[in-house]
Amino acid sequence: MRLISHKPLWLALVLPLVACSTTAPPAQVATPVPMGWQAPLPHQGSLTDMARWWTQLQDPLLVELIDAAQAVSPGIAQAQSRIAQARATQVGSRAALLPSLDAQASASRGFNDQLARVATTSQAGLQASWELDLFGANRAAKTAADERLAGAQALWHEARVSVAAEVAQQTSSIRTCLAQQQVAERDAQSRGETSRLSQLSERAGFTAPATAALARASAAEAQARASQQRMQCDVEVKALVALTGWEEPTLRTRLAQPVAAAPDTLFTVDALPAQVLAQRPDVYNAEREVAAASADVASAQAQRYPRLTLSGSVGAAQVRTGGVTTDLNTWTIGPLALSVPLFDGGRRAAQTDAAQARYDEAASQYRAKVRQAVSEVEQALVRLQSTAERADSAR
């Protein structure tokens, strides 16, 4: 009869569990991507490995400069720190799925009323607890942590590629500047010699004073351009010193060495935009953030439902009084505790709404990131095509 009297109570607790379920928004967001590029593809567009594209330039100095810049880059250091933070969060989320085990020990001495004498009591034990995660709150939190770790790793790759691109662009700019400086200095030297000869001819009466004056002005103008070009090259070199941490004399010595011509085909672009975008770490990170935000919504929804926790303990105690020692061993399984949210002033509902809003934001940012990536690739293709046309015209 006693068991029957408790049956309605258990039914009242179990039936709500059956009706509870979580519905998270989709972890992947459909984004319209063009079927093909509008700009022409270089070399008919075949896919190659872009992990270390700078090694394909056959420029040992550039590889050294990029490695040095990546070693001292604060952006890469921050990306590594974010990976460490994301990995720590992932470990914590995994731990929430496992039982917890704590050790306890105590000792006391005092008067025992039952024994009517002073007693020393010592005890030690293990306390275990495990949340059964009925509705997947902890599993969803782990999924979100996994996705954010993947996104943090993608941002680390993006930081590396960004530093490599910046160093490559700066190095190319310096070499172009130095080549222009040589042209400007030769031009200044040539015009200076022309001015000197014009002055000699003027003194001999073979050249009009106006012609000699024009030659002097031309020489002064060429000298000013050469000086301006040297200043620009010095600024470019100092910027590269700041990027790489190299000593300036060493950098200038290495830059003065001859450079092998870069291959015509450095890398190519796939004909399908979706495959190209899949290589971009920033797009991948935005995609992973959408998946993480979806898991956050599921976790927030699950927090509104009942929670079931199983506890247990095992221990040993010793009581010593009047020269007599008594040993006691204990163990328990339970209680099996069910916690049912009844009223929280709307806190859990607000947390769910906030998680949904963050998901909507992440989805919007992902779509914007895809559009931006398509635009950047299109612009880069246009620049590549223009550069190829100018190179053909210069030959």
PLM features per residue range, with description:
Residues 2-71, 146, 230-278, 320:
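Terminal intrinsically disordered/low-complexity segments used for targeting and assembly
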Residues 59, 72-75, 131, 178, ...:
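Short loop-to-helix capping motifs
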Residues 62-64, 121-123, 169, 214, ...:
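Transmembrane beta-barrel architecture of outer-membrane proteins
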Residues 66, 123-127, 171, 273, ...:
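Membrane-embedded beta-strand positions in outer-membrane beta-barrel channels/transporters
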Residues 66, 70-72, 92, 144, ...:
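Amphipathic alpha-helical coiled-coil scaffold segments and their short linker/junction regions
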Residues 78-93, 159, 165-195, 200, ...:
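Amphipathic alpha-helical coiled-coil segments
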Residues 97-119, 129-160, 178, 284, ...:
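Small/polar (Gly/Ser/Thr/Ala-rich) solvent-exposed segments
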Residues 202-206:
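A short glycine-centered flexible hinge/capping loop motif at secondary-structure junctions
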